[in-house]
Each structure stands twice: as C-alpha cells, then as structure tokens.
Amino acid sequence: MFMNPLLPPLWPMIATAVETETEIAPLVLAGVLLSLVVIYFASKLGGEVCLRLNLPPVLGELVGGVLVGVSALKLLLFPEGGLAPEDSLVIQLLMGSADLSPEAAQSVFSAQSEVISVISELGVIILLFEIGLESNLKELIRVGPQAAIVAVVGVVTPFSLGTIGLMTIFGVAAIPAIFAGAALTATSIGITAKVLAEINRLSSNEGQIIIGAAVLDDILGIIVLAVVGSLVKTGEIQISNIIYLILSATGFVVGSILIGRLLSPFYVSLVNRMKTRGQLLLVSICVAFVLSYIAQIVQLEAILGSFAAGLILAETEKREDLEEQILPLADFFVPVFFVCVGAKTDVSVLNPAVPANREGLIIAAFLILVAIVGKVVTGFTLFGKSELNKLAIGVGMIPRGEVGLVFAGVGAASGALDPATDAAIIVMVIVTTFVAPPWLRAVFEGAKKEEAPEKPVPTPD
C-alpha cells in the first residue's frame, strides 16, 4: 500500500484515541453514577425536610440542588460559567482514584455533565407529560368563562409588567426580559390544589375556578415558553415572527388534541391487545416522545409536545392506570431536573455585600412584587360576582413552583438568562411558593369567620 512519507501515520493516532476513549468511558459512567447518588440524596433530604415543614417537596429538591451545586458544596457542577474539572469534588475523587491527566479529567467532566443534562431534559419532558395527564379539559370547559378570564389576566398582566419593567427600569435586553417575564406567567397546579384539598375548598366555586384557571395558565404558559424559546433560537424579535410562533404553538396543541382524539381508540386497542409487561407505559411514553420530537423539529420546545401528549391521553380510559404507572418513572427522572436547576444557580450573585450584586437583588425584589400583584388582581377581574372570594382566587394563583423552575431551567440552558437574572427568577419561585400556602389558608379562614352567623347575646331574665 502506498503511503505518503510527508504525512504522519494515522493508525497510531487512531489507536491512541481509541485507547483514551476506552479508558475514559468507565470513568464517565462512574462520574454519572456518583452524580446521580448526590442528586437523589439531595432531592430526598430536601423533600423530606420541606414535607415536614408543610411545604412542597419540589421546593426541597430545588434547595437541595443549591446546596450541592456551585453555590455551596460543589458536588454537582457543570462546565457552564467557566468552571474547571478541579472545581468539582466528584471529578477530584475520580482524579485521585484513577490518576487522570488534566486533559482526561476535562473529557470526563464534559461527558458526564452532558449525560446528566440529557437525563435532566428527559426529566422535564416527563414532568410536563405528567402535568398534562393531571389536566382535565372537561373540567376546564365546565368552569369556562370565569377560569378563562382569571387565566388570561394572570398571564398577560405579570408578563407585560415584568417584561416592560425589566427593559425600561433596569435596562435588561429584550430576550432576557421576555424570558423573565414569561417565567412569571404559569401557576403551579400541584401546590394550590394541595392547599385547597387540605382546607376542604377544592370543590368550592373559588377552588374550581382556581384549578381551572391554573390548568389553562399552564397551557398558556407552556405556549409562551415555546414561543420565547423559539425567539432565543432565531435570535430575532419581529412581530411577524412572534405572531407565527404563537399561532404555530397554539395550532400544535389544538391540532395534537384533535388528532389525538381521532387516534385514541387505536391507542386503547393497541394497549389492550399487547400482553407483555409495561405495554401501557411504554406505548404512552412513545406517544410523548414522538410529539416532543415533532415539536422540536418545528422549532418549538420539546416539552410542548409531551404536555400535549398528556392532555390527549388524559381523555382516554387508560388515564388512571397511566397516572399510577408514570409515577416511578417520574420519581427517577424529575428530581434530576429540579436538583440540576438548583445546582446551576449561583446564589452568590445576589450577595448584598458585593456592590455589583445589588442590582440582581433589586431585580429579584421587582420580580417577586410583579409575581404577587400580577396574580392577586386576577380575582378582582370577575365583575358582578360578589359572592366569590376574589382575594382567595388571586392568592391561589400566586405559587409558581415546578413550572417556574422549568422556565428558569430552559432559560439558563439556552443562554438567554445571565446568572443574576436566573438567580432572581429562582428566588421569585421560592418566595411565591413559601408565601402562597399560608396566605391562602388565612384568606379562606378569614372569610369563613365573616360568614359565620353571630351568636345572639342572651338577655337577662
């Protein structure tokens, strides 16, 4: 075989690359396994503490992520932000046990971070699929106009105030401001529903309006996220582009639901005919992944597809079985997303002792104010409904919870948010999640005392 003497022989180079890759692969796996141990330990510890404090476990998962991430223990780190392998305690452990060179350590750090990031993205896809399953379109239609008014006002008001305020008052660039404004839109169904159930108000008129509006809020919020995410990809803000994205996102959800209803009998028939274990879960996950793929290739967010899949399958007779079967899968993947969001959040950028950080704190305070006011006003838009506890409806729409974290996670991953704005959104989510439950209880209990008839004062004989 003819070989050019001026060119270096390729085989030794290829062999060296293969050997290096072969040596690194087990270490990448070891790094992923150690990272998952850290993630699950942090999520369970934080979740258990919050549950005992009568707070949503998801908040504990977020705080657990903050503790093990870049802000504190540095057990779970990612290359974003210029972090080096030596900064990660997990990589330090691997370097000490395997005598890694700096180049090999960088390769392991990058590869294991990519794997964890992919698992995190799968977690948010499954989370939105689960939220879609829990959304009852028929119930939403029943509460109808009142829930729609609350939802639309609850999306438009905080989004407009947040975006315009960040751009005009703080001079934030358009796309980060739009992303932060979008993070103010969605309401956490789970947190509000839990509080309403605890105080026996879930079936009340106010409770039904809140839940119906929260469901519609989620749909509108995910559409807003898809539109904003697409704006980040294109890098352009044009009215025609925004209108196209809104129409395409709305059309995708509506079209998916309509087509899904036509194909639902085939889905049920297929699942019933299959005899192997896990047929319902795997077929359903395939539906979610296919719609996520379609959403992704048409320049929308993958989570919009999984959410639409959940809405579709929630209308079938398999809903209850699927809700039960999806739980173990969600328990495995979803905590990875929340802990990673917390781990990537550098709360040191909000340290008031550093003068340069004070603007970030002011932005956080501004977002918290808009997040609360923008939702409280929603109840008072129901004109002519004096019998309703309008303040309770508004307060019930305050908590952002997991949906707000989805916005923060997607925004940070896409590079649309700088560390200070990302941390400000995280603080907003934490504060609204803390504030809403006790306030909602107090509002309903106060109304109950006012409704109680006064006892007659006994007259002396």
UniProtKB/Swiss-Prot annotation:
Q: Does the keyword Cell membrane apply?
A: no
Q: Which residues form the signal peptide?
A: none
User: Which keywords, in A-to-Z order, does the entry hold?
Assistant: Antiport, Ion transport, Membrane, Sodium, Sodium transport, Thylakoid, Transmembrane, Transmembrane helix, Transport
Task: Please give the Gene3D superfamilies that the UniProt record associates with this protein.
Answer: 1.20.1530.20
Q: Look up keyword Cytoplasm and say if it applies.
A: no
Q: How does activity depend on pH?
A: Activity is pH-independent.
The protein's name in its UniProt record: High-affinity Na(+)/H(+) antiporter NhaS3
Provide the Gene Ontology terms for cellular component: plasma membrane-derived thylakoid membrane
**Gene name of this polypeptide:** nhaS3
Q: Where does the protein end up? A: Cellular thylakoid membrane
* The organism of origin for this protein: Synechocystis sp. (strain ATCC 27184 / PCC 6803 / Kazusa)
Family membership, please give it. Belongs to the monovalent cation:proton antiporter 2 (CPA2) transporter (TC 2.A.37) family.
Sorted alphabetically, the Gene Ontology BP terms of this entry are: proton transmembrane transport; sodium ion transport
Recorded GO MF terms: antiporter activity
TM segment ranges: 22-42, 58-78, 113-133, 148-170, 175-197, 209-229, 239-259, 280-300, 360-380, 391-411, 424-444
Function noted in UniProt: Na(+)/H(+) antiporter that transports sodium from the cytoplasm into the thylakoid lumen in exchange for protons. Contributes to sodium homeostasis and tolerance. Also has Li(+)/H(+) antiport activity under K(+)-free conditions, but not under K(+)-rich conditions.
